Design a protein with these regions (language model features):
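P-loop NTPase nucleotide-binding module
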Residues: 52-95, 152-164, 171-174, 185, ...
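Core recognition of P-loop NTPase motor domains used across DNA-transaction enzymes
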Residues: 1-55, 111, 125-127, 131-140, ...
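Cytosolic-facing regulatory segments adjacent to core modules
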Residues: 48, 82-169, 183
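Flexible beta-alpha connector loops of hexameric P-loop NTPases
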Residues: 35, 113-123, 142-148, 182-195, ...
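Structured core elements
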Residues: 38, 45, 58-62, 72, ...
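Conserved nucleotide-binding/hydrolysis micro-motifs of P-loop NTPases
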Residues: 66, 95-98, 106-107, 147-150, ...
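Phosphate-binding/switch region of NTP-binding enzymes
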Residues: 47, 193-261
């Protein structure tokens, strides 16, 4: 027996799709174009290349440990929340909420993170911290530090936030980091599990119509001189799965020469 599916699964004629495409093109070309383009990250050169974070896109941010991918992702999240007033959900599988808050506050206040962790603050640092706290107080940033969280659990938490009629829906999701996620089911191997996770992250991005920034580790192969003489990462260096670049709409690599100096 063949049952009729949801409207979203029906075949769409090209004529209808062209009308929608032309309508969207008029929007992004008109005087209110900024409302219809991707969400600005606050980093001008990056926004020029990406035209912002596209709704429904899965963006992979990859680097070796210690390269600064968490700090960079938190910087984007903070700018999106504060400058664009777009609610951001941060799922940290590596750090606690307290550690995330420390990083966000120290970055916004311009205080050295080491001094922040040890409490070795100067008198003026407390003033900067007070100003940063005031600026961040109403920033729509939501954090979750559940270890081994699944995509199903993430969606449930996002929908719970979105049910509140007094505030706008979550508009950006940041996940730190991909290799610490689980499917909640038994998998034959880790490569298959990561493949399932990235595929379902892309589906979640489309379902919720939000960009997802998922941080990813790189394999140790990038450290080997024979891989490429400058240690600059490439797609083949993504750890645990070849499907990451297939499911992602964009892959960003962080690299600093000084890291290898």
């Amino acid at each position: 027996e063949i049952r009729s599916g949801r409207d979203s699964s029906a075949l769409t004629p090209l004529s209808s799709s062209m009308v929608e495409t032309l309508t969207n093109l008029q929007k992004i070309s008109g005087p209110d174009a900024d409302k219809y383009k991707g969400i600005p990250t606050g980093f001008r050169l990056l926004d020029t290349v990406l035209t912002g974070l596209g709704r429904g896109d899965l963006i992979i941010l990859a680097a070796r440990p210690g390269m600064g991918k968490t700090s960079f992702a938190l910087n984007i999240a903070t700018r999106v929340a504060m400058q664009q007033k777009v609610p951001v959900a941060i799922f940290s599988l590596e750090m606690t909420k307290e550690q995330l808050t420390n990083r966000i506050l120290s970055a916004e206040a311009g205080i050295d993170s080491q001094a922040f962790r040890t409490g070795a603050l100067r008198a003026e640092d407390w003033e900067y911290l007070a100003l940063a706290t005031e600026k961040l107080h109403d920033a729509p940033i939501y954090m979750d530090d559940t270890s081994g969280i699944t995509i199903t659990e993430m969606k449930a938490k996002i929908r719970r936030v979105n049910q509140d009629p007094t505030r706008p829906n979550v508009g950006l999701i940041v996940i730190d980091y991909l290799q610490l996620m689980t499917t909640g089911q038994r998998s034959e191997n880790r490569v298959q599990e990561i493949s399932s996770i990235t595929r379902n992250l892309k589906i979640m991005a489309k379902e919720l119509n939000v960009p997802i920034i998922a941080l990813s580790q790189l394999s140790r192969a990038v450290e080997k001189q024979g891989n490429n003489s400058s240690h600059r990462p490439q797609l083949s260096d993504l750890r645990d799965s070849g499907s990451i670049e297939q499911d992602a709409d964009c892959v960003l690599f962080l690299y600093r020469d000084s890291y290898y100096a």
